[in-house]
Every structure is written in C-alpha cells, then in structure tokens.
C-alpha cells in the first residue's frame, strides 16, 4: 500500500504544517481613523516571517499601530498621519495629495484596507498620474495600478532591501527561512521518489513514463501532476 502524499499530510492539519501565526507581533496595517494626527516612532522591531523591519507608532490620540519601517526612519522620530500631511519621508499621506514622481510604499487600494501594494523589504511604488478620483501608481513589477485618491500610503522606501544581498551559504539557513513562513522546503520531485511514495516514483529513471494529466475528480492519492489540463507541453506554432 502506498504512502500518503505531501498534500495529504498537510491537509490533515497537524502542527507541522500549521501557520505559526501566534509568532507574529500583530497586524501591520493602518488604523481606520479619519483626520490629521502627529505620531511618534516608539520602537523598530522584527516581526517573525517578515524581512522588513516594523515600526511601532503612537499617535497623539493614543492610537498605536504597526507599519513598515522606512529607510532612514529612527526611534523617537515624529511623523504625520492622515490628510494634509506634508510629503516627507515616513509620513502617511492620502495618495491623492502626492505629486507625480513621489515614491511611496504600503499603498492602499481603497481607504481602510490597511495597505496592499509595495509592502515587502526594499520595495516602493511611484505615482505616475491622476485620472478623476483615481491615482495611477507604478508597482515594483512595472505594472500600472489605479487606486483611490483617498487611499493612504507611506512616503519612502521600505527598509531591509539588502536582505537578498547576503548569501545563505548553507542549506540550514534556507531551511529556517522557510520554516518561519510555514512553507515546505526542500521540495522533492515525485520522479525522484520511490514507487511507494508517489505515483511518479520508481523505475530507476527520472521520468514520469506515463501520462501526467489527471482527472479533476481523481482521489487524493492519485491527484498529482497536470490536474485537469487542457493540454501539456510546448504550444506548436500554426
């Protein structure tokens, strides 16, 4: 009898595969408040599972929240939050107030969603234009995205951009990188397994040696490969 596949073991819901959300220090997002406030950076901390450092900010009305730390941000720095804030590094502004060419990060799509775009370490977006009640921004992928002019964004570049410059040097470092993100690593190919471990395993060769397409209604132990694929392989020219 064959052994369970990786997705079958993960689907069981054991602690090995469960998301370690209890490690996180909190949600990194803007608070849903209106108006203009002066805030102060209380601390800059590490949030497990994130490469970018996180800044703990306290506003003058007593509200505390976590936001992406910006390059150049320091503890005890004063920042401004909300509509009417000047275009200065670390300030949270309404993106409709930003002129073209402004570098921003942690951009909301609509007011109140907490921030959706350019949130990872070293990333930023650029305001490239305005159209009615929408603001056009260029994302790190070079795609142009239209967001609400009431959406909030932080002026500057997310800190921690050099995280990919340091080499991992050994497999153990990569293991712990994925471990804190609750991702499976390393990924073993099915054709490299024994026949008891995977439908593509066995045979003393590194090939599937059978059709890799599988029905959408296949049972879990057989549902691997190209699931419900219309076609496989390279598309031939006309």
UniProtKB/Swiss-Prot annotation:
Basic residues composition bias: residue spans: 223-238
Entry keyword ATP-binding: no
Key words, A-Z: Ribonucleoprotein, Ribosomal protein, RNA-binding, rRNA-binding
Single GO molecular function: RNA binding
Pfam families (UniProt xref): Ribosomal_L2, Ribosomal_L2_C
Keyword Cell division: no
Family: Belongs to the universal ribosomal protein uL2 family.
NCBIfam families xref list: PRK09612.1 (NF007180)
Protein name per its UniProtKB record: Large ribosomal subunit protein uL2
Native species: Saccharolobus solfataricus (strain ATCC 35092 / DSM 1617 / JCM 11322 / P2) (Sulfolobus solfataricus)
Lineage, top ranks: Archaea, Thermoproteota, Thermoprotei, Sulfolobales, Sulfolobaceae
């Amino acid at each position: 009898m064959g052994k369970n596949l990786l997705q079958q073991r993960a689907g069981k819901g054991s602690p090995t595969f469960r998301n370690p959300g209890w490690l996180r220090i909190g949600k990194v997002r803007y608070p849903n408040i209106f108006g203009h406030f002066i805030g102060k950076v209380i601390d800059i901390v590490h949030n497990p599972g994130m490469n970018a450092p996180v800044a703990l900010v306290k506003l003058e009305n007593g509200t505390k929240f976590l936001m992406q730390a910006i390059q150049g941000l320091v503890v005890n720095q004063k920042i401004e939050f909300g509509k009417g804030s000047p275009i200065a590094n670390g300030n949270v502004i309404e993106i409709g107030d930003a002129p073209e060419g402004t570098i921003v990060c942690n951009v909301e799509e609509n007011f109140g969603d907490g921030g959706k775009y350019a949130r990872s370490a070293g990333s930023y977006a650029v305001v490239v234009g305005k159209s009615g009640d929408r603001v056009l921004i260029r994302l790190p992928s070079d795609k142009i995205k239209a967001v609400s002019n009431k959406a909030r964004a932080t002026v500057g570049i997310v800190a921690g951009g050099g995280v990919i410059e340091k080499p991992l040097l050994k497999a153990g470092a990569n293991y712990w990188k994925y471990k804190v993100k609750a991702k499976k690593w390393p990924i073993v190919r099915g054709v490299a397994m024994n026949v008891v471990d995977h439908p593509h395993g066995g045979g003393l060769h590194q090939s599937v040696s059978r059709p890799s397409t599988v029905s959408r209604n296949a049972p879990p132990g057989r549902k691997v490969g190209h699931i419900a694929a219309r076609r496989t392989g390279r598309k031939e020219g006309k």
